[in-house]
């Protein structure tokens, strides 16, 4: 049976770092970083970069070096998130415009409006999930609540705001090819490429957001 690791408080973790052969140049600074960002996020996530083939830390490795890599990675994630959000906003705007223009702002969540080559059951399941999300947000999201109470439906340009990037990607995939092409044309790429980009963006965004 694998022995469960015992809890160590920040001071104990600081000493544990030293026993691993990692150089600590400033006890107070290192302790604050452990408290603020967690030992696991800093050491466990990046330790392999600084270890040799014997699974021991390379000679001369300092905590500051490991933390610098953690900081670099964190800042890189923030950059990715910033530009993914920009692209997401653009796609949402164009997508809602295409759907509204071609299918109206009321009856767009109908199976016949989507790709006929996709199984109707799968499309209906996706539409049901979108409708469930609308119902869930009713009473919580101001715009959703307003449109349901006043008009009895939610237009695409409002719905699009509550969809995650993953849900947005699925909605785009369900569109008829001619509609996907109208969206992708705005980015000067094919609908096939945009579909793949959206899937990749969803994966990268989730990794960055959850610090995996």
Predicted segment positions?
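Long, contiguous internal "core" modules enriched in hydrophobic/ aromatic residues
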Residues: 1-212
């Amino acid at each position: 049976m694998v022995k469960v690791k015992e809890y160590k408080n920040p001071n104990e973790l600081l000493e544990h770092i030293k026993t691993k052969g990692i150089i600590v140049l400033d006890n107070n600074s290192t302790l604050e970083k452990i408290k603020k960002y967690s030992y696991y996020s800093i050491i466990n996530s990046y330790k392999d970069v600084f270890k040799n083939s014997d699974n021991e830390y390379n000679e001369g490795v300092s905590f500051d070096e490991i933390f610098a890599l953690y900081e670099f990675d964190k800042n890189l994630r923030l950059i990715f998130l910033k530009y993914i959000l920009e692209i997401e906003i653009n796609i949402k705007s164009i997508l809602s415009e295409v759907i509204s223009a071609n299918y109206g702002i009321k009856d767009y969540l109908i199976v016949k409006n989507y790709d006929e080559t996709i199984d109707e059951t799968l499309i209906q399941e996706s539409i049901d999930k979108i409708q469930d999300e609308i119902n869930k947000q009713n009473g919580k999201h101001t715009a959703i609540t307003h449109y349901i109470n006043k008009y009895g439906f939610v237009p695409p340009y409002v719905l699009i705001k509550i969809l995650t990037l993953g849900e947005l990607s699925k909605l785009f995939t369900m569109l008829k090819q001619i509609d996907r092409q109208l969206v992708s044309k705005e980015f000067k790429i094919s609908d096939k490429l945009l579909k793949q980009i959206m899937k990749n963006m969803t994966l990268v965004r989730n990794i960055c957001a959850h610090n995996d």
